[in-house]
Amino acid sequence: MRSEKKSRKFWFIAILCLIIVLPAGWYLWSRLEKEKPTLNMNLLSPHLGQSQVFSLVVSDAKSGLRRLWVGLLKNGQEAVLHDEKFPSAGFFKGGKVHETSVKIQLAPEVLGFSDGDAILRTVISDYSWRGWWKGNITYTEKNVKIDTRPPEIEVLSRAH
């Protein structure tokens, strides 16, 4: 009789644990997803003139976008071109925005950059719980060349 009560109690606790642990484990597994946000940059040329518009398409299908940051770096000087934070749908749901498109106007001289090599940086994060709720991060750097001066033509001789 006593062993039958222990057996029933054991099975009751085991089934109760499965009912709680399996859904909780599945939910944690989905919130701790490791898929990084994707970036599609439409930069026509790595050579930047006086003014140029380029577009970015960023997406994260699973947990939603948290932040998009774009900056230009040259000789230790950095200018923020775009910084956008996306809203959360709630602690348990992730982000409201899963895909967005952004057009960025880039004018190096207005930002105080002279001609030469520079780096275009992008940082995108999502609402995954990975990294102690910091999310997955996509970090890219693209080497660009700032060239704002038009070419000059000099006449070498009048003999031709």
Question: Model-predicted segments: where are they?
Answer:
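Hydrophobic membrane-insertion alpha-helices, especially the h-region
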Residues: 12-27
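Long, low-complexity serine/threonine/glycine- and acidic-rich segments characteristic of extracellular
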Residues: 6, 38-40, 45, 55-152, ...
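Aromatic-capped interface at the extracytoplasmic side
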Residues: 24-42
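N-terminal Lys/Arg-rich, disordered targeting/topogenic segments
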Residues: 1-9
